[in-house]
């Protein structure tokens, strides 16, 4: 069961890596006339694979009263019965009896005893460091362009492959922590990559020496991580506990922030954290509190004045240090995810879908610290996978939609809709590159079209081609080479592959068998902040 919109690689491992509990597309039904199983046994059979044996989360979020506080029980029952299309959660109405669903719902709203905790002492005690790593050679110990390196996360068997972006040959393959978040983060020199796992582990890996440097567990159920633009800081966003944790570059804990309102009366899961390099800060979205936080790693950051302060004269407010302090921006509603415009002056985020179908996208000015516009995108825009590019003399945003087969194009000066581009079905990822006139997007949320990749001309905003995989198999997540000449897609299956396409002719060039390559990330495009990929 899933009660959040979450990255689909979580689903990938849920359905295929956990044996009997995730054996097939439809779980085994309770035999007719059989005595009702205990609720704990039902949970272990149908839910534990994704949400953890103790309900503390894994591929899916934690199922605890505090994490379900905003979901009413009748709505939870409906989710279990009907599934949730946005996360590809399977429906259980034909698998479980009504009384079993009701019992499961009641049970996940009861507290876990003893209550799960993860303290600063636990974080510090979890840290592991490889001896002698500071003496390792300061250059790549392999022959390839280190800037055209791809890091490929294989969710099928929890491995990472390092791929030469020129020859498309693997350089190295190593095992990873379970259920990595799909977005590894790189240091600006390209030497180190940081991985975050859903069960809270952060791994620092030396790409030049092909060895793990250090690991630490930031929480029990972690959303994602960010690395500062100068490579000196790492921040983790947790669902459980409700914290944001700051580390130095060696993964030594520096500070833990309780994700609460200013008065401390309400706490929240943390939706996401991203680095805003030009601002020398991390920006944090809270899932249950309508606030956006900015935490500066600039020692010269101006002081913070909480509350209604009209100017900064003595007596108007008590200042807090700006360096590593929390600067709060109040919102109308919480954001599930967000990304930045190219100037990093604005955060573009999406709240949960509104019941009346009205747009839920928001534009937040980080300097004015307030919402300045509503994005005219209905449904469930996946802004975190949107891209920006120039069109007809203006900058536009193009965003896929988790609910509709539509790419919405928004003018970033007026925040008005330019065009809706139809696709075969709802999609998750959209990617492009400065050196190509085309953008690629998937339809992986559409059962009958998940094998189709749509190619859109950025000059005309029209679809010009489709790339198709085998029907019934998911083709998703494009990433370009450093020069933009080739596009790499994932055949998102346990017996899957990494498929290399010519970005100009759309012809397949090469296919490398891989175990569910849920994401691949070009080092140069990431550290150079390419407009065609996520950062």
Summary of predicted features, one role per range:
Residues 25-37, 44-46, 90-156:
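Flexible coil segments in periplasmic/lumen-exposed cytochrome c-class electron-transfer proteins
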Residues 30-33, 49, 54-59, 63-113:
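Extracytoplasmic electron-transfer domains, predominantly the class I c-type cytochrome c fold
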Residues 132-133, 137-140, 180-185, 221-227, ...:
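Repeated scaffold domains used in trafficking and secretory/extracellular systems
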Residues 144-146, 188-189, 229-230, 277-278, ...:
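Residue-level detector of Asp-centered blade-edge/turn motifs that repeat once per structural unit
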Residues 165-167, 206-210, 248-252, 297-299, ...:
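Short loop/turn segments that connect beta-strands within beta-propeller blades
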Residues 169-175, 211-216, 253-264, 322-330, ...:
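A short beta-strand motif characteristic of beta-propeller blades
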Residues 218-291, 308-326:
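Asp-box/WD-like beta-propeller blade repeats and closely related beta-sheet repeat scaffolds
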Residues 426-496:
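Loop/turn-rich, solvent-exposed surfaces of beta-rich toroidal or solenoidal domains
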């Amino acid at each position: 069961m899933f009660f959040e919109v979450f990255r689909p690689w979580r689903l990938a491992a849920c359905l295929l890596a956990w044996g009997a509990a995730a054996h097939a597309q439809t779980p085994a039904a309770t035999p007719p006339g059989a005595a009702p199983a205990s609720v704990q046994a039902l949970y272990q059979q149908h839910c534990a694979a994704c949400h953890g044996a103790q309900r503390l989360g894994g591929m899916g979020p934690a199922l605890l009263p505090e994490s379900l506080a905003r979901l009413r029980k009748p709505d939870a029952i409906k989710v279990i019965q009907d599934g949730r299309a946005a996360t590809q959660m399977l429906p259980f109405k034909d698998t479980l009896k009504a009384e079993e669903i009701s019992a499961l719902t009641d049970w996940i709203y009861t507290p876990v005893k003893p209550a799960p905790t993860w303290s600063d002492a636990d974080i510090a005690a979890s840290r592991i460091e490889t001896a002698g790593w500071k003496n390792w050679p300061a250059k790549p110990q392999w022959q390839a362009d280190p800037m055209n390196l791809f890091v490929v996360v294989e969710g099928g068997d929890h491995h990472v492959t390092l791929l030469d972006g020129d020859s498309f040959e693997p350089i190295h393959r190593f095992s990873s922590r379970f259920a990595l978040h799909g977005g590894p983060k790189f240091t600006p020199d390209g030497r180190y990559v940081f991985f975050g796992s859903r069960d809270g582990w952060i791994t620092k890996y030396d790409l030049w020496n092909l060895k793990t440097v250090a690991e630490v567990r930031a929480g029990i159920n972690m959303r994602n991580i960010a690395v500062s633009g100068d490579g000196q800081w790492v921040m983790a966003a947790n669902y459980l506990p409700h914290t944001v944790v700051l580390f130095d570059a060696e993964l030594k804990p520096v500070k833990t922030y309780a994700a609460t309102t200013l008065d401390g009366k309400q706490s929240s899961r943390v939706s996401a954290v991203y680095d805003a390099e030009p601002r020398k800060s991390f920006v944090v979205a809270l899932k249950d509190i309508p606030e956006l936080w900015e935490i500066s790693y600039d020692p010269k950051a101006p002081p913070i004045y909480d509350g209604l302060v009209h100017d900064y004269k003595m007596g108007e407010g008590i200042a807090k240090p700006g360096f590593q302090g929390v600067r709060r921006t109040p919102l109308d509603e919480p954001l599930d995810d967000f990304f930045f415009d190219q100037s990093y002056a604005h955060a573009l985020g999406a709240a949960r879908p509104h019941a009346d179908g009205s747009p839920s996208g928001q534009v937040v000015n980080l300097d004015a610290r307030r919402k300045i516009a509503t994005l005219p995108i209905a449904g469930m825009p996946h802004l975190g996978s949107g891209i920006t590019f120039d069109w007809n003399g203006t900058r536009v945003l193009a965003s896929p939609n988790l609910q509709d087969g539509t790419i919405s194009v928004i003018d970033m000066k007026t925040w008005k809709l330019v065009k809706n581009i139809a696709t075969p079905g709802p999609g998750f990822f959209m990617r492009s590159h400065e050196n190509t006139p085309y953008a690629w997007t998937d339809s992986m949320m559409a059962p009958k079209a998940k094998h189709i990749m749509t190619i859109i001309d950025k000059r005309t905003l029209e679809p010009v081609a489709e790339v198709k995989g085998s029907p019934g198999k998911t083709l998703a997540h494009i990433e370009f080479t450093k020069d933009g000449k080739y596009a790499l897609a994932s055949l998102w299956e346990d017996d899957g592959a990494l498929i290399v396409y010519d970005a100009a002719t759309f012809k397949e060039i090469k296919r490398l068998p891989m175990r569910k390559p849920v994401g691949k990330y070009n080092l140069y495009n990431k550290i150079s902040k390419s407009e065609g990929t996520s950062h």
